[in-house]
Amino acid sequence: MAILEIVKEPAEVLRKKAKPVTKINASIRKLLDDMTETMYAAPGVGLAAPQVGVSKRLIVVDPQDGSGQLYQLINPEIVKAEGWVKGTEGCLSIPGMVGDVWRYEKVQVVALDRTGKKVWIDAEGYLARIFQHEIDHLDGILYTDKCTNLRPVSEDGEEEEEAEVAEVMPEPEAEGAGEPSAEGAGQAAAEAGAEEGEQVTTGVSGERRGSAAAKEE
């Protein structure tokens, strides 16, 4: 495995819609492994192929919540979603900044694993947020397109340390404010009333920490 260079905004590849993977071979599996190594080295909890300069629909995710669960997903797609929650996010491709982003609270992701088997992943809280953030990367969308209160990391370095640790950084106790971003808010309003959810928290003690169950076809 190799540690790859993480490309930074305004790299063009970050704004392209990534191409689906049509053949799973040794090079795809190696890329997944290299992305995993790069994610851990960053360190982060998620990474999408465009972030290492490859415009393919691949993501790797490890919420690092003590479960030991690593997701290496090919052509991931969100097929179900419900609820809204606001959290603070950072991005390895946009260092030094954080912002508040409304996301679905629960999602179901369908994808292929590294062997080509179809998997369904039901995720909520932190894990659901990571999946949404990484899948956005595959469509050329950055969290800054959706966020409010975009800001530099704090001078004391606490936010900076967290932002470097996590591709997605939920804020422990954010105050409720505003509404979901215009993108997708209309649909969410019809489905869930677009009400602000309880804030996702970080750390082992977080009540809304992500959880998931995966099933294979």
UniProtKB/Swiss-Prot annotation:
BP term (GO), one: co-translational protein modification
Cofactor binding annotation: Binds 1 Fe(2+) ion.
MF term (GO), any: peptide deformylase activity
Keyword list, A-Z: Hydrolase, Iron, Metal-binding, Protein biosynthesis
Biased composition (Low complexity): 177-192
Substrates-to-products reaction catalysed: N-terminal N-formyl-L-methionyl-[peptide] + H2O = N-terminal L-methionyl-[peptide] + formate
Enzyme class at the top of the EC tree: hydrolase
Acidic residues composition bias: residue spans: 155-176
Keyword ATP-binding: no
Cofactors that this protein relies on: Fe(2+)
Gene3D superfamilies (UniProt xref): Peptide deformylase
Bias (Basic and acidic residues): 206-217
Presence of keyword Iron: yes
Signal peptide stretch: none
Region (Disordered): 153-217
Active site positions: 134
Function: Removes the formyl group from the N-terminal Met of newly synthesized proteins. Requires at least a dipeptide for an efficient rate of reaction. N-terminal L-methionine is a prerequisite for activity but the enzyme has broad specificity at other positions.
Family of the protein in this entry: Belongs to the polypeptide deformylase family.
Protein name per UniProt: Peptide deformylase
Organism: Symbiobacterium thermophilum (strain DSM 24528 / JCM 14929 / IAM 14863 / T)
Lineage: Bacteria, Bacillati, Bacillota, Clostridia, Eubacteriales
